[in-house]
Amino acid sequence: MPSTKVAALSAVLALASTVAGHGYVQNIVIDGESYSGYIVTQFPYESNPPAVIGWATTATDLGYVDPTEYTNADIICHKNATPGALSAPVAAGGTVELQWTTWPDSHHGPVISYLANCNGNCSTVDKTKLDFVKIDASGLIDDTTVPGTWASDQLIAANNSWTVTIPETIAPGNYVLRHEIIALHSAENTDGAQNYPQCINLEITGSGTASPTGTPGEELYTPTDPGILVNIYQSLSTYVIPGPTLWSGAANNAVASATAAASATATPTTLVTSVASATDSPSTVAPASSTTATSVLTSVVPSVTSFVPVVTVTDVVTVTTVITTTVF
């Protein structure tokens, strides 16, 4: 009897660890204004959830998309994603801070952000028609010790947040910002990488004219990309950030180059991407009509610890084995 109850307790705690361990973007701060993301631990269970800029998903287990699904629409904005009803205004050159609920420190990997022009209202866009341009990317920062310091570690150190600068030269219009962490803690195994894509709607303003050519979401990665199938538990002389090349018009942020490596002497390698004009033929795009989010939606952001199991043990049980849980 006692051993049965200990096993049951262990199972419940393991489930709680899995649910609470992975994160999602719960809040977005744009030029000082806060907007709610899609609260996947709450909204799916409400009969009338609020309209937000974040895309809805069915990933209530806070799970991931693996490489077997790279040609599936789920890789675009997560499981069964549908567009957010609202868009948040941001000026070209402005910043977007994406605040995650949490992120496990064992889940090392790159942080990548893309923009895709909706060419209309993002609330009704067909996600499979979106072409994504990489505007921000950071991967391996320091390989002094295995498994190294990664962009995900910087995100954790920044209170589980990541700031993306909207390129100054991008043409105005309605865009989807696709923001993603790729966890590589199991990536030495085939299909072991874990993608956690998050999408929000933006209405970009400004006088830019650049309309760079993008890549469909289902073509961003392959299971054998060197930055996807990789063993981070050995010293890496090179790490190639997955996906298309960083756009030349991306903001002048310090990022890990898509082709640069941490040096053999274990000195952190950080390159600054220079601001340059897009090589694509520029065109002026006027924003289509959209529903703009104007209010701060703070009341819908719940506590991170939204799932806390309650376990009652009526018998006195002596446990001599330490039970540990692992976040997968």
From Swiss-Prot:
Glycosylated residues: list them. Answer: 80, 121, 159, 235, 237-238, 245
- Binding-site residues for O2, renumbered to this chain: 185, 194
Q: How does activity depend on pH?
A: Optimum pH is 7.5.
Xref: InterPro entries: AA9, AA9_LPMO
Its uses in biotechnology?
A: Lignocellulose is the most abundant polymeric composite on Earth and is a recalcitrant but promising renewable substrate for industrial biotechnology applications. Together with cellobiose dehydrogenases (CDHs) an enzymatic system capable of oxidative cellulose cleavage is formed, which increases the efficiency of cellulases and put LPMOs at focus of biofuel research.
The protein's annotated catalytic reaction(s) are: [(1->4)-beta-D-glucosyl]n+m + reduced acceptor + O2 = 4-dehydro-beta-D-glucosyl-[(1->4)-beta-D-glucosyl]n-1 + [(1->4)-beta-D-glucosyl]m + acceptor + H2O
Provide the transmembrane region boundaries.
Answer: none
Claim: Oxidoreductase is one of the keywords in the record: yes
User: Which cysteines are disulphide-bonded?
Assistant: 77-199, 118-122
Cofactor annotation remark: Binds 1 copper ion per subunit.
Return the EC number: 1.14.99.56
- Keywords linked to the UniProt accession: Carbohydrate metabolism, Cellulose degradation, Disulfide bond, Glycoprotein, Methylation, Monooxygenase, Oxidoreductase, Polysaccharide degradation, Secreted, Signal
According to the UniProt record, list the residues that bear Methylhistidine: 22
Q: What remark about domains does the record contain?
A: The extra C-terminal domain (residues 249 to 328) participates in protein stabilization and protects the enzyme from thermal unfolding.
What biological function has been recorded for the protein in this entry? Lytic polysaccharide monooxygenase (LPMO) that depolymerizes crystalline and amorphous polysaccharides via the oxidation of scissile alpha- or beta-(1-4)-glycosidic bonds, yielding C1 and C4 oxidation products. Catalysis by LPMOs requires the reduction of the active-site copper from Cu(II) to Cu(I) by a reducing agent and H(2)O(2) or O(2) as a cosubstrate. Shows activity on cellulosic substrates (Avicel, carboxymethylcellulose) and xylan.
Q: Which family does it belong to?
A: Belongs to the polysaccharide monooxygenase AA9 family.
Q: Would you tell me the protein name for this molecule? A: AA9 family lytic polysaccharide monooxygenase A
What lineage does UniProt assign to this protein's organism? Eukaryota, Fungi, Dikarya, Ascomycota, Pezizomycotina
